[in-house]
Curated annotation (Swiss-Prot):
NADH dehydrogenase I subunit C: annotated span: 1-183
UniProt KW keywords: Cell inner membrane, Cell membrane, Membrane, Multifunctional enzyme, NAD, Quinone, Translocase, Transport, Ubiquinone
Organism: Chromohalobacter salexigens (strain ATCC BAA-138 / DSM 3043 / CIP 106854 / NCIMB 13768 / 1H11)
GO terms, molecular function: NAD binding; NADH dehydrogenase (ubiquinone) activity; NADH:ubiquinone reductase (non-electrogenic) activity; quinone binding
Function summary: NDH-1 shuttles electrons from NADH, via FMN and iron-sulfur (Fe-S) centers, to quinones in the respiratory chain. The immediate electron acceptor for the enzyme in this species is believed to be ubiquinone. Couples the redox reaction to proton translocation (for every two electrons transferred, four hydrogen ions are translocated across the cytoplasmic membrane), and thus conserves the redox energy in a proton gradient.
Catalytic EC class: translocase
Membrane topology value: Peripheral membrane protein
EC numbers: 7.1.1.-
Protein name, entry field: NADH-quinone oxidoreductase subunit C/D
Pfam families registered for this protein in UniProt: Complex1_30kDa (PF00329), Complex1_49kDa (PF00346)
């Protein structure tokens, strides 16, 4: 691949052992290195080498077992592409190695006249949905894909929304109308066609029944449909159908300033609250060169763990409800109310505080915050004991969950499973330990693990995680650092209020950053966190402007739903419901 490499990029990757192995196997001329703030090697290559390179990385000693993310970028309006190969569009592949505890990103440059790249679904099975989404959003063709169809948009949709020439506002479209004929067309387009998915309507001994579970079903946990192929009560196969909750979150980031996009992050996993803010603001802080104060880091950790408990309580109640236990959800919601009282007392809001800021938090901790938090810490441990005794030790629940919808660590990694669902298989990988961020390296806590990767382990593990979250929060209360809640940096947005009220320069900066937005230098950054449901990451592309050129949001729930057919083939329908309850997803996290 021909492109001049900057000395910075060459130096950034020269000593990396994986890059050296690639250079030794394929030749340095095949790759172009890019210097970024992503924290991993970034290499461009021609598409004819893609499959061979991916196979090499997957099969090497200490392999890259997981395709963590795959998506695209419309490069046509990007102003700052110095030292990068010519490209109208880019497809990127982020690979993760659990054994090496490191990532690598590969990029393929494409011309608008030839938007085609080979499918990698034969190398990494979870590439299937990612490639469908890239085709849906950008119109890039993946040669050899088994079923390249719309994923998030309706089957009848025209255009590819993440292209730069596609409108970003509803006011740029004609007023929406739906005629009777149009409604019939849309309904017919949603009719499930088994043959299109390679399914048979009958076997030698039976006629299969096809059943829609959802998109409006209590156990679907949102607007979500699964088309089931059934032999009696046995699930022969199934096809998850997503997109009903798609809101264009990545597109909206292209018309919001770095600061004003924060409230949108709250609503990706709407049960995670400020946990969603964290990877975004950390990625922006990398671009801005902001080092957050120890106090701000600790406050962020404390509130993130509060929302982890809050989310896990919601999971526990609905998980048990899906198994037929109707009472527990009322107990867990009582505890969630107590958590919300703490959250509201500190941030001023409940579900969607949008409280983290570029450089810190919206304001400092209020007077009496420690007593408020301590009251919750004193309350919860005995409740977790009750949940375990009354529910997880219940013989009926154990019978319904043990060895049901089990999968191995290898299978989990192949499908991109992260978080508690991965750790339930016995895989000891938690970003808070393996790649500490926001000061997690200063906390003493354990990472709970399962053994069987089944429905029971996924439930028990989240109870154990709540205990560890309480342990972390207690350390925050006992050792909260003194100091500022915001960094003293020109790009901290908004600037500290005390300085804004006393210095005209800071007042001017405040006005510009809030009304127009901070200007960040061209570069790319990526931040990953251990969110409530798994690993959540934001990959940001800055082009020297007040807003993001491209924002890629990788959520944990998306690959978890793609794995459903592999986990439940041969199971009974009630076991499918148990599995759905155990993987802990919300559709806003899937569809974005």
């Amino acid at each position: 691949m021909s492109a001049a490499q900057s000395p910075t990029a060459q130096h950034a990757h020269a000593e990396d052992p994986v890059v050296q192995a690639l250079f030794a196997r394929f030749g340095q001329h095949v790759f172009v290195a890019q210097a970024t703030h992503t924290g991993m090697p970034v290499l461009w290559l021609d598409r004819e080498y893609l499959l061979e390179v991916l196979n090499f990385l997957r099969d090497m000693p200490e392999p890259f077992e997981m395709l963590f993310d795959l998506h695209g970028i419309d490069e046509r309006l990007r102003s700052h592409r110095e030292d990068l190969p010519p490209a109208d569009f880019t497809v990127f592949y982020q690979l993760m190695s659990i054994s090496r505890n490191r990532d690598i990103m590969l990029k393929v440059a494409l011309s608008e006249r030839d938007l085609e790249v080979p499918s990698v679904a034969g190398v990494y099975p979870n590439a299937n949905w990612y490639e469908r989404e890239v085709w849906d959003m950008f119109g890039i063709d993946f040669r050899g894909h088994p079923h390249l169809t719309r994923l998030l948009m309706p089957p009848t949709w025209n255009g590819h929304p993440l292209r730069k020439d596609y409108p970003a506002r509803a006011t740029e479209f004609d007023p929406y109308t739906l005629t009777v004929e149009g409604q019939s067309t849309e309904q017919e387009a949603l009719r499930f066609d088994p043959e299109a998915w390679g399914m048979q309507r009958q076997s030698e001994n039976t006629d299969y029944m096809f059943l829609n579970l959802g998109p409006n079903h209590p156990s679907a946990h949102g607007a979500f449909r699964i088309a089931l192929q059934l032999d009696g009560e046995v699930v022969v196969d199934c096809v998850p159908d997503i997109g009903y909750h798609h809101r264009g979150a990545e597109k909206m980031a292209e018309r919001q300033s770095w600061h004003s996009y924060i409230p949108y992050t709250d609503r990706i996993d709407y049960t995670g609250g400020v946990m969603n803010n964290l990877p975004y603001v950390m990625a922006v802080e990398k671009l801005a060169g902001i080092e957050v104060t120890d106090r701000a880091k600790t406050i962020r950790v404390m509130m993130a763990e509060m929302f982890r408990i809050n989310s896990h309580l919601l999971f526990l109640g609905t998980y048990l409800q899906d198994l037929g236990a109707m009472t527990p959800v009322f107990f867990t919601f009582t505890d969630r109310q107590k958590a919300y009282e703490v959250i509201e007392g500190i941030t001023g809001f409940r579900m969607h505080p949008a409280w983290y800021r570029i450089g810190g938090t919206a304001h400092d901790l209020p007077r009496g915050w420690d007593k408020l938090v301590q009251g919750f810490l004193d309350w919860m441990p005995k409740r977790l004991v009750e949940y375990e005794r009354a529910m997880m030790e219940n013989a009926i629940i154990r019978e319904r969950t043990k060895q049901v919808a089990a999968f191995t660590t290898r299978e989990a990694l192949e499908w991109g499973v992260t978080g508690p669902n991965l750790r339930a298989t016995g895989c000891d990988f938690d970003l808070r330990k393996q790649r500490p961020y926001s000061g997690y390296e200063n906390f003493d806590f354990e990472v709970p693990l399962g053994a069987n990767g089944d429905v029971f382990d996924r439930g028990q593990l989240r109870i154990d995680e709540m205990r560890q979250s309480l342990r972390i929060i207690q350390q925050c209360v006992d050792h909260m650092p003194a100091g500022d809640y915001k960094a003293d940096h020109p790009l901290t947005t908004p600037p500290p209020r005390e300085k804004m009220l006393q210095h005209i320069e800071t007042l001017i900066t405040h006005f510009l950053q809030v009304s127009w937005g901070p200007v960040l230098k061209p570069n790319e950054s990526l931040s990953m966190i251990e969110a409530t449901k798994g690993i959540n990451s934001y990959y940001l592309t800055a082009d020297g402007n007040t807003m993001s050129y491209r924002t890629r949001i990788r959520t944990p729930s998306f690959p978890h739903l793609q794995q459903i057919p592999a986990a439940v083939r041969g199971a009974l329908v009630p076991d499918l419901i148990a599995h759905l309850g155990s993987i802990d997803f919300v559709m806003a996290d899937v569809d974005r």
